[in-house]
Each structure stands twice: as structure tokens, then as C-alpha cells.
Amino acid sequence: MQRLLFRSLFYISSLLLFYCFYKVEIAQTIKRQDYLFYYILFSLIIFFYFLFISIKKYSEYFFIIIISILGSFSLYEIYYVYSNKNKYFENSYHETEKKKYESKMNFYNKNKEQDDSSIIAYNPLIYYQNNQKLLPISHATNSNMILCNEGGYYSKWSSDRYGFNNDDAVWNSKKKKIILLGDSFVEGNCVNRPDNINSGLQKLNEKYNFVNYGISGSSLVHQFALLKEFWPKNVSKIFLFYYEGNDLVEIKDEMKNPIFSKYFKDNNFSQELMENIKKSDEVYRQVFKLHMENLENNFEFQRNYEISNNYSKVFISILKLTNSRNMINFLLSKKKISDFNDYEINLYEETLIKVKKFVEEKNSQLIFVYLPEYSRYNTFKYYKDKFYNYNQYNYKKIFDMINKNNIKIIDIHQLLFLKKKDPLECFPRKKPGHYNEKCYFDISTILNNSLN
């Protein structure tokens, strides 16, 4: 019986190992790291099978080892499913998600009744069509923008004449300007305007006019386009914010967009958005209707699909040892330097050099601000059904890149988070997401001190 079972495991493992090899090395449709767990597991089974038939004296022990390994992984899968049973098998999870969705829609509808310009902020890049002649790269202008809820309330702010999170009077001021360039952390997602980084700087320093160019979901190519399109007069400095959580991922996606690609490749390319801001506004509002339809349709589809397919999904997940694979890959990744982001890092540096040259030609100074992500400080680094880990290797490479290009660095990880007893206090309810109001102001203080 042992021999028959072991032989069956051997044949199955051999076939699956060949399948993994084909998918990773020949078809190249899967990253090697994603299937590393299966490589190891199937190789172990094959290895112990040969020991089983070669050293009969200890064959029973080899059999027990393999069964113990497979049994341990299976028990872990069952434990994981049990610990998340509310999400998988009960309606309470879906009802919670439904309440979140309905809460946001109710907030939007109430604001819409009071202010017809109300609109839920989104990144227009995600709805870009190949035949689209104009791509908005900021939000709707002079509008009541509604964002997210991480701290117990939905944040909102009034956009300026170009679709940024500023008081419109900023464009009339004759003071020297400092531009804040970045993604949702700069834009001020999930907090109201008085509590974002830009507002904090304005409270602390009346010498400069601080202008917020933050756009959610943007990386450096998008941000370079913002500078080229909306460069104002009398700019002294640029605070360029790098968020380690997703900037390298998003810059690769931006280069796939033909219009952003033109910004990168052609120094003279422009959509003349300052002059065409009304047209940009029209496109943004038209696409917003599609965005609202997708919000509703995706929620209903996802909810119905998950409820009807949970049992089959869980069974397949256990069979594939999905969570065991994620755990092993995560543990191995901490001990291994990975270079899979080298393309993104090189692309980021190429764009950074272009940004630096552009800024210096305008007689301004570029200052690089490093923003850390939640998983850097999360002890377990496991949330949203996946393992996450900040990449210390990328951290070093980014800093080497910035130093090589002679750009001043402000490291918020070192200057703020490492000085806190519990860095997770910077995140609302200590959950993954954006920073809270207090830490946004702490960052404003650090940036202001760098100016003095």
C-alpha cells in the first residue's frame, strides 16, 4: 500500500514538475518565484521516492516524512480557511462590503444634492481608450471631490482651476512657489484639506506658496507630465515624493499608455492642458459616468460571484496549497535579494533624470522625499489574503540612484517612523492604507525644517 501510494505521488509530482517547468521556463507565463514552492515540493517528493526504493531499510521513514510534509501543509490550508470562515462562507463579510459601498454612494448623493459639482475622484488613466485624443491628467476643475474613508469619515476637498487639491487663490499669489509632486499620499487621500501635507506646510511657513500637484495612482511619468503641462511662474523648489508601496509598479503601467509614453520620449510633447482645461474637464466628467457604472456593476458582480463560487474556490485553494505557497515564497523572499524590479528601477531613474533636468532648466531645485509603506512596520506582514514585504534591496537601490544623481534626500522612514515606539500609529486604526492627520502634519514639519 505504501509503495503504491508513494509511486502515485511520484508520477503525479513528476507530471506537475514538468508542467511547472513548461509554464515558467518555456512558455514564460509565470514568474519563477511564484512557482518556487511547487519546484521544491515536487522535487522533494521525487527525491524521497528514489530514497524509498533505494534504501529499503528506511523506506518507511521516508514515506512518513513525505506524508508529514503534505499533511502539515494541508492542515495549514484548513486552518487558514477556518480562521477566515466569516469571509468565505458567511454573508456578514459581503454585507459589510455592501454597507461600505452604500455608505459611499449615500455620501456622494447627499453632496450632489447640495453641490452639483460633486464627483468621486478617480484616475482617468484606468479608462483610457487607444483612440482617445486627449487624456486628462488631473481631476475635474472647481469641483467638490469625494475620496475615501479610512479614519471614520469620507474625505472631500474643492479642486482648483486645474483640478488639484489646492485653494484656487494659490495661483494668484506672487510668493515663491514650492510644488509638492506625488501620488495619493501627497494629494491627501482619506483626510480633509486642512490635514494634508500641503496644508500643514502652508500653516508652518508663510514665506512660500505651497502648491499640491498630488494625483492618486500616479507615478513619475504621470508626475513629469504634470510638471510639463502645469508649470507656474516663480517656482523655487519641487518636493518629489516617492512612495515605496507602488511607485515602481505604476511607472511600468504608465509607460504602456501611448500619451504618457510621448511625454517620456518627446521633450516637446504637450497636450496644452492649461489652454485646453475645459476640454480636459469635459472628458473627465464624461468618463466619470463610466466610472460610476463600473463601481456599481463590479460590486454586484464580485459579490454574487464570490458567494456562488466560494466552496469551489476554497476547495481548489486547498488542493493547490495556495496559502502555504504564499507563506513559503514570502519567507524565502526575505532571505533572497530579488532583481525582478530592475526594469522599473531603471525606468524610474531615466524619468528622474528627465525631471531633474527639466526642473533645473527652470532654475528650481528638486528635493526627493521617501515615503515608507505599511508593510515595512507590520510585524506579521500578512493582510488582504496575501503576504507583503517591503523590499530592502529596492530601498538601497533607490537611495543609490538619488545620491548618484546629486539630489537632496529627505527620508521620512528614518526621520519620523523609526523614531516612533509603534510606527503603525501613523496609520488609521493601525490598518494598511494612508497616513493619519497627525503623521501628515509631522511630515509637513520635517519638510519645513529642511527649508530653514
Give the location of each predicted region:
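Histidine-centered active-site loop/cap adjacent to the catalytic His
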Residues: M1-F6, P428-N452
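Membrane-interfacial loop-to-transmembrane alpha-helix junctions, especially the N-terminal start
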Residues: Q2-I12, Y58-F63
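Membrane-embedded alpha-helical segments of integral membrane proteins
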Residues: S8-L51
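Serine-dependent acyl-ester chemistry module
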Residues: Y11-A27, Y243-F399, I407, I412-L418
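Internal/C-terminal transmembrane anchor helices
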Residues: K57-Y80
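Hydrophobic alpha-helical transmembrane segments in integral membrane proteins
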Residues: S74-H94
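Membrane/wall-proximal cationic-aromatic binding patches
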Residues: K87-L204, L416-K430
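Conserved SGNH/GDSL esterase-like catalytic core that processes O-acyl groups on lipids
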Residues: K156, K177-I179, E187-S270
